[in-house]
């Protein structure tokens, strides 16, 4: 699973995800992409599950790019522990995703295969997503 090698701080504020994505909103590598339509924290496990779903759907052909990285440590307190006594220890890593952000990109596969792969990946993610194509026309994805 993805996680940073080294961080400046061990724990992070919870924070809120405001506004739309400024960068990472257009296809840079592949012909097809999966775009986030809602703000949410996506965990490293969810990213890995979506990556596996895409890899299985495309049957090891084409190329996949992961455009998000889990760089926020999410801490939680153990079960049945009273409030106070400091913040819990970091449990997992997450990526803060804003609407409009490209999550995954695919190239070297036909449109219908890419659409199927992204639909399967979307089921593993906690947000609404949209399949986009470099041509801007997604009518050939339904074929």
Swiss-Prot record:
One of its GO terms (cellular component) is cytosolic large ribosomal subunit. The keyword Membrane does not apply. One of its GO terms (biological process) is translation. The keyword Ribosomal protein applies. Coiled coil: none annotated. Keywords: Ribonucleoprotein, Ribosomal protein, RNA-binding, rRNA-binding, tRNA-binding. InterPro entries: Ribosomal_uL16, Ribosomal_uL16_bact-type, Ribosomal_uL16_CS, Ribosomal_uL16_dom, Ribosomal_uL16_sf. Belongs to the universal ribosomal protein uL16 family. Binds 23S rRNA and is also seen to make contacts with the A and possibly P site tRNAs. Part of the 50S ribosomal subunit. HAMAP family: Ribosomal_uL16 (MF_01342). This is Large ribosomal subunit protein uL16. The gene is rplP.
